[in-house]
UniProtKB/Swiss-Prot annotation:
InterPro entries: CemA. The lineage of its organism: Eukaryota, Viridiplantae, Streptophyta, Embryophyta, Tracheophyta. The gene is cemA. GO terms for biological process: potassium ion transport. It comes from Arabis hirsuta. The keyword Cytoplasm does not apply. It is found in: Plastid, Chloroplast inner membrane. The chain crosses the membrane at residues 6-26, 107-127, 189-209. This is Potassium/proton antiporter CemA. Contributes to K(+)/H(+) antiport activity by supporting proton efflux to control proton extrusion and homeostasis in chloroplasts in a light-dependent manner to modulate photosynthesis. Prevents excessive induction of non-photochemical quenching (NPQ) under continuous-light conditions. Indirectly promotes efficient inorganic carbon uptake into chloroplasts. It comes from the Eukaryota. The keyword Coiled coil does not apply. Keywords: Antiport, Chloroplast, Hydrogen ion transport, Ion transport, Membrane, Plastid, Plastid inner membrane, Potassium, Potassium transport, Transmembrane, Transmembrane helix, Transport. It catalyses: K(+)(in) + H(+)(out) = K(+)(out) + H(+)(in).
Amino acid sequence: MAKKKAFIPFFYFTSIVFLPWLISLCCNKSLKIWITNWWNTRQCETFLNDIQEKSVLEKFIQLEDLFQLDEMIKEYPETDLQQFRLGIHKETIQFIKIHNEYHIHTILHFSTNLISFVILSGYSFWGKEKLFILNSWVQEFLYNLSDTIKAFSILLLTDLCIGFHSPHGWELMIGYIYKDFGFAHYEQILSGLVSTFPVILDTIFKYWIFRYLNRVSPSLVVIYHAIND
């Protein structure tokens, strides 16, 4: 009975890891049809921001230029204007369908992320006792490690998160989150986040070493600085 109770927090942690994937899978299947019908039947105005509107106009201009170029390189004695307009019309309809699919995908992912956040928040709130047990297990495991292993682990983690090559990883991660929530790609915003977020983490980490580790384990701080130097 005691072993069974001891495994309950472990099962709870496993459920937290896989619960977002299950929520995403269920929401994508159940909400996609509803959101698609709502978007297509309502025929609401597209809520474009300045970045998205500029992107749409650029794609329309590129589409028209490609058709004009295609007609110019053809060695026909006379240009069939009606056929040209028909091709433009078909490609425009196809582009509108793709644009609608993009908005449906954006709404679907944003709704799924919001639902996942609400469910996980409630799940974590009702399982505070299990989280407390897991936290005690982690603290006990870290406490039993030697100071050398702790210092090496801290150094490895900081180099991965805020090291010289970390901006490439942050760029991929922030870009994925930015895209998953349906925001339009904006290079300046992404560059700003990539350049400032690791700096903020570095400052917080140095403050944590100065404020917490110096008080709890001064020897760990000495070993960390020795390895880092």
